[in-house]
A protein has these predicted regions:
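Helix-loop-helix "hinge/cap" segment bordering the ligand-binding cleft or interdomain interface
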Residues: 118, 145-221, 241-287, 292, ...
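General small-molecule cofactor/ligand-binding pocket signal
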Residues: 68-74, 275, 318-320
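Extended amphipathic alpha-helical segments with heptad-repeat/coiled-coil character used for oligomerization
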Residues: 313-335, 390-410
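Short beta-strand and adjacent tight-turn residues that come in two discontinuous sequence segments
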Residues: 96-97, 297-300
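Ligand-binding "clamshell"
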Residues: 104-119, 306-332
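Positively charged n-region of N-terminal signal peptides that target proteins for export
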Residues: 1-7
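Conserved N-terminal structural module of periplasmic/extracytoplasmic solute-binding proteins
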Residues: 7, 18-190, 234-240, 247-251, ...
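Conserved small-residue motifs centered on glycine
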Residues: 44, 368-493
Length: 545
């Protein structure tokens, strides 16, 4: 499945609420005799779009908001093209779908290249103001330490994405071997041993536990993350935990050593192979699809399983709940900690009329209808109003029925929508508002993911986690990036070596911890603490989504 297709599928599975949104302010085009304002806009279109100039939503935006768009396109390597444009001084009035880290926002904001948006948001974009109040982490990624807002993010409120480090188990195997769903590390070990020693009838060359490598193309298929969380919090990315408001590096703590000891035990008992730490998605998914795997790591089982296909056992794959640790508590890695950057920015090349027109478009996009039209084009093409009685992901009356399966099928091309370009708002209302396919039906994998997440993962994250967006000062970016890369690379290398036994946890642990410290861990933590501001509060992420 293509990346964009998965992003829509994961957040949407098509979307409840109301098309305009009860609290939203619809932007309506006022009759105007003035000449359209011409705006240079940078964007990075997907390969599915035929032509941005003739695209239906381009024409709709131009007519509705009285503007002519001159596109600067970067379909390949947009980050490099954006940097070159900014360095040359010949940059556009608007970056519609660019990419600015907080440090870049500060850098170009302090240089006067990016225009503070505060007053324009208040004047022209009340829907965006409302979204900032209701979307966790949105204000944090938008508001720089100097109080200015230099950009706007994309919002993708994907419930099951927030707990993507999942383990999936074939419950048909459990039933055949008269086993219960494991709830602790010891119980999981016993289940895997049973799969190995007493494979179900007809299964040859069984693989009790499988996973994918970090650069293999699978989605959150890391073997260690789910397991490690039974011993210490592991967020899979920067390895930070928050203790009493302080940033702590998990991989040097005793809990990390205990987790590695357990994972090494699984390895030495032949419950997974070293390939599970490195293999690509083709190898990994192939093994699952051959029916040889009992448990596997993946954010969404639908990537590894031919969902709805006869003989694939798709209906038997269920999530293993987060394992309870020695304290009897369970926790899961959390990825809903806000957006890490912004995509939309206005530069000092923009005139007041250009700013007004483009901010009115942003305001429209920050509605359920606006985001749906931006993504898929006009009503009646790829989406229609839901019928009475059709339900959304959370079981309430749906509003929109989106044919995302056709829109994203194979190498299909279209010229109707912009397909997730720019500061769209795939909000909770948008996600919940689409007609849900029953979880046990072919094509119902998104509903299944929602249900599995609500049942087993939602609410099992720590109250406070490290935010996705942190404000590193421009003068410290290079140093911070070097520390982060060197430390995390070192940790990942030693973690794999501890797991397979080329490093010994008893004799080499102290050398490992010293190695991390020697790479500048203390300074890295100080910079992270300062840039964090305050931890991300996850308390709103619970319940039905």
């Amino acid at each position: 499945m293509k990346t964009k297709a998965f992003a829509v599928f994961t957040a949407l599975s098509v979307a409840v609420c109301s098309l305009g949104g009860a609290a939203s302010t619809q932007t309506k085009a006022a009759p105007s005799k003035a000449a359209p304002v011409t705006i240079d806009m940078f964007t990075s279109p997907g390969s599915d779009i035929v032509n941005m100039d003739t695209n239906w939503f381009t024409k709709y935006a131009e007519k509705t908001f009285n503007m002519n768009i001159k596109w600067i396109l970067a379909p390949n390597d947009p980050g490099t093209k954006q940097s070159l444009l900014l360095a040359s001084g010949d940059y556009p009035a608007v970056f519609w779908s660019g990419g600015f880290t907080p440090a870049q926002e500060l850098k170009y904001g302090q240089q006067g290249v990016l225009v503070p948006l505060n007053k324009y948001i208040q004047e022209y974009a009340p829907n965006l103001v409302q979204a900032m109040k209701t979307t966790p982490g949105m204000a944090q990624v938008m508001t720089a330490p100097d109080g200015n807002m230099y950009g706007i993010p994309q919002i993708n409120y994907c419930w099951h994405c927030a707990w993507a480090a999942k383990y999936w188990i074939n419950t048909r195997w459990l039933k055949e071997l008269n086993l219960k769903m494991p709830s602790t590390p010891d119980e999981l070990f016993n289940v895997l041993m049973a799969f190995k020693n007493h494979p179900p009838a007809g299964v040859k060359n069984v693989i009790p536990l499988d996973a994918g490598g970090p650069n293999g193309g699978a989605w959150h298929a890391n073997l260690a993350t789910f397991l490690m969380n039974a011993f210490i919090y592991d967020d899979e990315t920067d390895f930070f935990t928050i203790q009493n408001g302080k940033v702590v590096f998990a991989p040097t703590q005793a809990g990390w050593k205990a987790g590695l000891t357990y994972i090494h035990k699984l390895y030495t008992n032949g419950l997974f192979s070293s390939e599970a730490l490195t293999q690509n998605s083709t190898q990994y998914y192939g093994q699952v699809q051959q029916g040889r795997v009992g448990v596997f790591a993946e954010g969404g089982s639908n990537d590894a399983i031919n969902y709805g296909q006869a003989g694939s056992d798709w209906q038997y794959w269920k999530t293993i709940p987060p394992l309870k640790g020695a304290n009897g508590q369970s926790q899961a890695a959390f990825f809903g900690n806000g957006e890490s950057n912004v995509v939309f920015a206005i530069t000092n090349k923009a005139t007041p009329d250009q700013i007004k027109a483009i901010m009115q478009l942003v305001n429209f996009v920050y509605t359920v209808r606006g985001t749906t039209m931006l993504d898929f084009g006009p009503q009646g093409k790829y989406w229609t109003p839901a019928k009475p009685g059709e339900l959304g992901l959370t079981g309430h009356q749906a509003l929109i029925n989106v044919d995302w399966n056709t829109f994203y099928s194979g190498s299909a091309r279209q010229n109707w929508g912009w397909d997730q370009q720019g500061p769209y708002d795939q909000s909770k209302a948008w996600r919940d508002g689409g007609v849900a396919i029953p979880a046990t039906s072919p094509g119902g994998s998104a509903t299944m993911l929602q249900q599995e997440t609500v049942k087993n993962y939602a609410g099992h994250q720590p109250r406070y986690v490290f935010p996705a967006s942190v404000w590193i000062q421009p003068s410290q970016v290079q140093q911070y990036s070097m520390l982060q890369t060197n430390i995390n690379t070192f940790v990942n290398q030693w973690t794999d070596q501890f797991i397979v036994g080329t490093k010994d946890l008893n004799t080499d642990w102290n050398a490992y911890v010293q190695g991390v410290n020697n790479l500048g861990l203390s300074q890295y933590l100080q910079l992270s603490q300062s840039a964090m501001g305050k931890p991300f509060d996850t308390s709103s992420f619970k319940g039905e989504g």
